[in-house]
Amino acid sequence: WGYGKFGSQNESNNLAEDLEIVTGCLREDFKLRPEEDGARIIGNLTFEERNRRGEWMSINCRDDVGDSGYGVPYNVESEKLRLVSHDIDFMMAIETGGMFDRLVENGFDENARCGLIHLKGQPARSTRRIMKRMNEEWGLPIVVFTDCDPWSFRIFASIAYGAIKTAHISEYLATPSAVYLGIDSDDIQAYDLPADELTSRDIEALKAEKSDPRFQSQEWMDQIDLMLELGQKAEQQSLAKYGLDFVTDTYLPEKLRQKLGIVIG
């Protein structure tokens, strides 16, 4: 037989996907651990996580963690992680670490009665799964706060509708009721945000999204068309043009009121 080594990472990834499809089980059931990190969570939520000795540990994501938050494990199914209680009104998923840290520093989780979850860019499976569970089991709305570029749009799409690579388990990972909060193309104009020119790769990605089934709503078509018309993209950090507290004092309260009817304060 010789050595059973994989020639590349893609070989093992494809095998894991095939196993999931053939068996109807998740890769976590096979103890296959991804290299990707899970999210960080801050907020008044309490979980119970089973430790290596098989004992349940109670963890409050506000009182029992430091500023970096609770690290989401690779397996967040009920046999490893229990959702115990919460005293929040919604979960906000945040793309960048800098913005997550800013919201934590400003105490936005307590002021807005929300949980904050750092996506670390394209979210890991465990990140999407725990958001799905909190939405279904606790009835918490999921709102997504990202940069304004085609790649960030795809981050939202992977949360709300699922990713191509994990299409076979979208029912476990996707949260169709998730709401895209911003930054969107309208904000570049409305808030006169510092912006960068779209690259040829950005433009190609936006044109591809116009035929992507996940972006066929009129709202998404309008956003994509406006970005192409402006020829610009913007980062979350562009909101710092108006000071470090602008995002928590003005921008997010305005967007939450507009899109979800949530009034802060």
Description of each model-found segment:
Residues 147:
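Glycine-rich phosphate-binding loop
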Residues 1-141, 150-265:
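Nucleic-acid enzyme cleavage-core boundary/entry regions
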